[in-house]
Design a protein with these regions (language model features):
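Alpha-helical scaffold/interaction cores of sigma-54-like transcription cofactors
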Residues: 1-657
Length: 657
């Protein structure tokens, strides 16, 4: 069967631009009998792990659409011009180069509205393990042909041709040869993208010019889509994201179309072509069989590799040459002595016995040390004890960690799990471990908000600044927010009515248990394990919402605003923005910038791990939660007032007056 490999594909990790979840890309490939897909999100590789998981049975290729500065990337003079260049990892070494490239592009000295590099800096990573192709109308080669990027809005080929450089052939040839020299003769391809030539005549003109350059230089061409959603009909949902991104609505877009005014991201509002097409559709768009066949050549150049790993615990610096297991044993012996007053008090007041404590401690110790978790408990204990040594208040124990007697004996928690009949298995279930990988415990540690930065500094000093970083998290279009975005884009109702409608859509946290049951059922039925908050609200607040939308006996959504509710359900779960995770930090064995992309967090000015918590853990990294709790700050403030007599003095003065 004739086929091709889509090499230029965006997921929802291209925030408010790409719509598709990795699972939707995989489904589309299976529908079209395509062998796999690349993922080339804008300036990031944050979706690599989830994409590889979703592409089970298909070939995933990890790539990135880089932002290339035409000048020295350290110069920030108000010029925001950037070229687009797609780069793919051929193998595991190629992945490491992508990590290094995205990390460097996010350095504060290079980041300027977008993560960016210049070609000279990019060249040092092109050691034969990367494949590059030239890019679309926003590429370096396109800028060598057209002297004005107003070419995007040209209505005819004649208008576009009038914007070409007289010496475009020499300019483009020189640029193409430079890129081939950077990446290597067999690793650079000229990208032919004609999916939207009818709406953008400049695309057809660009393709003609690039094909000429290909013949002149011998650099082969490849055909690509510029997929921002999986299917043509998904275009309408992607436009909701675009309205959010450029703060507009469909009414304004239509008015601009009529008046001829420029529309930001206008191509997406005029076309449904930015999907993953079939081979036959790519031919209909105007690609040649050779260009499509060359995509399979590229795919065959890319090896299979696995980014996941069993946990790689950092080594705790134990004293006196002891192993981590020996040192943990020593601390537990001392902790047992220190906790005797509390343990004996519990024994005297309850039915529990000292033997029960010993058996539980030995059981936990065997389970945790047998799977090599001694270092983890030493790391957690060290952080807590250091904070207390600095006079900081810490929490008594949060969540399932209170079910560990080891943590209680060490003094990490102050909740006796035997006294309160708490289960160790809720904290750590060894039955989840496999021969390939073990699961890590999850200990949430509470600290004063005002002192949290000192904790982070201590951890960085202890394990090395290059091995410790906070991580990013993504906000998603979910429930109430998704419905509001759809209603705003359609100018469907007043702000006040919008609030009345969405008041009946609960927050995710309020119905987390119910949603989890829906997700599990969806998985059992062959789905992706997803659950819609909006649909849950329609089912459970039917009377409240029926004037706007309701579910009929056949399970279909009806009512005056049914289409908007359906669209909001479709975009639920789409990633919307990124920020620094409130609590999670990564402590890694390896230098972080070598194993995961480091990204620039604009709000804090910090460089953080550019992947989500679960993905980082899947790669073998250790996550520690350092939570800031305002109540601890208040308690410390009250203690200080008491300590220095201020509170007593104020009370006396108040009483005397």
């Amino acid at each position: 069967m004739t086929t091709y490999f889509p090499l230029h594909v965006h997921s929802h990790y291209s925030l408010l631009d790409g719509l598709s979840k990795p699972s939707q890309i995989a489904r589309r490939c299976k529908e079209l009998n395509l062998p796999g897909s690349a993922i080339t999100d804008h300036g990031n590789i944050s979706g690599a792990i989830s994409f590889m998981k979703a592409m089970k049975g298909l070939q995933p290729i990890i790539g990135c659409e880089l932002y290339i500065s035409p000048n020295d990337a350290t110069i920030k003079d108000g010029d925001r011009t950037l070229y687009h260049l797609c780069v793919l990892a051929k193998n595991m070494e190629g992945w490491r180069r992508l990590v290094q490239i995205t990390s460097e592009s996010n350095k504060p000295e290079h980041f300027y509205y977008k993560p960016r590099l210049d070609l000279d800096r990019l060249a040092k990573y092109a050691d034969g393990n990367l494949i590059a192709f030239s890019g679309h109308l926003g590429s370096h080669l396109s800028h060598c042909i057209f002297k004005d990027m107003a070419v995007h809005d040209c209505k005819t080929a004649e208008e576009a041709k009038a914007l070409t450089y007289p010496d475009w052939v020499q300019r483009t040839t020189d640029a193409a040869m430079r890129l081939r020299d950077i990446f290597g003769k067999d690793n650079f391809f000229i990208e032919i993208q004609v999916i939207d030539s009818k709406n953008m005549p400049a695309c057809a003109l660009l393709a003609t010019g690039l094909r000429y350059i290909s013949k002149k230089t011998g650099i082969p061409c490849i055909a690509t889509p510029d997929a921002h959603y999986a299917k043509p009909e998904d275009a309408y949902d992607q436009r909701i994201l675009l309205c959010n991104a450029i703060n507009t609505n469909f009414q304004t877009i239509e008015e601009k179309k009529v008046s001829g005014e420029n529309i930001g991201m206008g191509a997406f509002f005029r076309s449904r072509q930015y999907h993953i097409p079939s081979y036959e559709t790519m031919i209909q768009y105007g690609n040649t069989e050779e260009e499509l066949a060359n995509t399979m050549v590229v795919a065959q150049m890319c090896e299979s590799y696995d980014l996941t790993s069993p946990p790689k615990l950092p080594k705790f610096p134990c004293p006196d040459g002891m192993t981590s297991r020996q040192y943990l044993t020593k601390l537990l012996h001392q902790g047992w002595i220190d906790r005797q007053p509390q343990i004996q008090n519990t024994i005297n007041r309850t039915h529990h016995t000292e033997q029960e404590y010993k058996d539980r401690l030995n059981e936990e110790y065997k389970i945790l040390t047998d799977v090599g978790l001694s270092d983890y408990f030493l790391i957690v204990n060290d952080i807590i004890q250091w904070a207390r040594s600095q006079g900081q208040l810490t929490g008594a124990g949060r969540g399932s960690a209170a079910g560990s007697l080891i943590l209680y004996i060490l003094g990490v928690t102050h909740v006796d799990p035997i006294e309160f009949d708490l289960l160790f298995s809720r904290f750590y279930n060894a039955g989840r471990n496999t021969a390939e990988r073990i699961s890590l415990p999850d200990v949430d540690m509470d600290f004063e908000i005002q002192q949290r930065f000192k904790i982070l500094d201590y951890i960085r000093q202890r394990y090395g600044r290059e091995h410790v970083a906070q991580m990013l998290t993504f906000t998603r279009l979910q429930g109430r927010g998704a419905l509001k975005d759809v209603m705003r884009a359609h100018s469907a109702m007043s702000f006040e009515e919008m609030n009345r409608v969405t008041a009946f859509i609960p927050d995710e946290a309020e119905i987390s248990d119910q949603l989890q049951a829906v997700k599990e059922l969806d998985k059992q039925e062959g789905g992706d394990g997803e659950a819609s908050i909006i649909r849950w609200a329609l089912e459970h607040h039917a009377d409240d919402l029926k004037q706007w939308a309701y579910i009929d006996d056949d399970g279909n959504i009806q009512g005056p605003y049914a289409k908007l509710f359906e669209q909001a359900i479709r975009i639920e779960g789409t990633k919307k923005s990124q920020s620094k995770h409130a609590a999670g930090i990564i402590i890694a064995q390896d230098v972080l910038s070598d194993i995961c992309p480091m990204v620039y967090d604009k709000s804090s000015g910090e460089t953080i791990c550019g992947m989500e918590m679960n993905d980082l853990e899947d790669m073998g990294n250790v996550k520690i939660d350092i939570l800031g709790v305002a109540m601890l700050d208040k308690c410390h403030g009250i203690l200080n007032l008491l300590k220095y007599g201020t509170l007593c003095k104020e009370n006396n003065e108040s009483t005397n007056s």
